[in-house]
Amino acid sequence: MNLLYPFIISFSMIFFAELGDKTQLLVLSFSTKNKAYKILLGVALGTFFSHGLAILFGSKLASFSHISFQFYLKLFTYFSFILFGIIGFLPEKPNTNTTKKPSFFSRFSHLHLGAIGMIAISIIVGELGDKTFLASLGLGLEYPLYKFSLICGSIAGMVLSNLLAIFCGK
């Protein structure tokens, strides 16, 4: 298997899983105040760390040689990916709590990270446990020898899908 096949699989899986996701809404909100290149760099950097972690973790789990363990782990990963997709369509309950909590961004404002750093941190935190994160974990399980191609495909899929959100925000 050449390096292009895992790249294409990773790109297409992440791209389509990201469409309409909360990360796109986050990027849409960033696009009102930041330049597109800063947002895309932040998305690429955040994706590198979050999805890279998922792919590396998945490929490490794939190194366990017990076949039934791998089967159930893949089954759990793909089932949870589908479950997260279904949960995304369910309506949320309205929040009746009126107390104001400090925003996520105000906690990091003293670090002076700049726009790219704030976007990257937002993407990292937003993607942990997300369906695209689980998809990356599953890709790492399925193709443990092609980590570089999977990470590059994941970054390309996230950047391209969020580029659509930037165009909508401008």
Residue ranges of predicted features:
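Selected transmembrane alpha-helices and immediately adjacent juxtamembrane segments
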Residues: 90-91, 98-133, 139
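Residue-level signature of catalytic and energy-coupling elements of molecular machines
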Residues: 21, 82, 130
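Juxtamembrane transmembrane-helix termini in multi-pass membrane transport proteins
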Residues: 2-69, 134-157
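Physicochemical signature of membrane-embedded alpha-helices that form the seven-helix bundle of GPCRs
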Residues: 13, 73-76, 110
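Membrane helix-loop-helix hairpins that form the core translocation module of multi-pass transporters
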Residues: 35-104, 164-170
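Alpha-helical transmembrane segments of multi-pass membrane proteins
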Residues: 13-17, 47, 80-88, 122-126, ...
